[in-house]
Amino acid sequence: MNTMEIRYHRLHQAMQERELDAVYVNAPENHLYMSHFDNPDGYLLISADESFVFADFRYTEAAKENVFPCCIVKEPGKPVLSELVAEKGWRRIGYEDESLTCAALAGLQKKMPEVEFVPTGDMFAQIRCAKTEDEIENIVAAQRIAEGAFQHILSVIRYDMTETEVAAELEYYMKKNGSEKPSFDTICVSGSNSSRPHGVPLPVQLEKGFLTMDYGAMVNGYHSDMTRTICIGKADEEMKKVYSTVLAAQQAAIEAARPGMRNAELDKVARDIIDAAGYGACFGHSLGHGVGPVSYTHRTLPTN
């Protein structure tokens, strides 16, 4: 089976387990994952033996060129959807409760009162967990672009640059070198702002001290997520201690990782080192997380 056939096989198995006649897919990452088509204002309807792409006039031409074999429905309005569901006789339809709004669900239920809409929870997240070889290649390609951006910024960064200029330089390099778009809003914070893990870049000159950059590239819909911290000016002893502690924790976790290990066990390997150095209260994040069609998958390395 090719990659798309594997995805549909997994989805059909999950649908069978939940006794679903069809699944209504509206989350952009899952729409792209199941169709090879980026359709931000449309949706998919997938049954055990058929798939339908609902796209308006802005996207139908692109859909014909890019979409995985599906029936393309040019009118995405609810009457067309309800007519199709009635024609097929579907009575249990799964929906993505993590992305479909309450208002949208209420609209579907009003148009199709005879249908039971069933929340799918993390069904798609579970399906996306196991990666095929070509998926891994896309993630690696995205990461290589991000790594190239880091090397690039080291070669061009200046004291008189602003946080927003550094962020823009990272994004420009990634776009120029094959990234479809940033994985998420690029973070670039310096000096006193560098303590904010998800701080917003400001049009202010770089401060001396730490400069933290958190960014990612996207290749064929697959994301990378990379964080790097450098020092503007000369690092003091405390900065060197922090750096050495984090590096030691990372290396210990990499060396300890093995198949079958519980996520919490691996997290503890790194966390114990950081705790022993006196920085335990500053380690609020989990040790790591997965990447794929989204930049932060539900597969994390938590403390429990």
Where are these regions (language model features)?
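Active-site neighborhoods and metal-handling regions in enzymes and metal-associated proteins
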Residues: M1-R299
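A short, hydrophobic C-terminal helix/tail in secreted or cell-surface proteins
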Residues: T300-N304
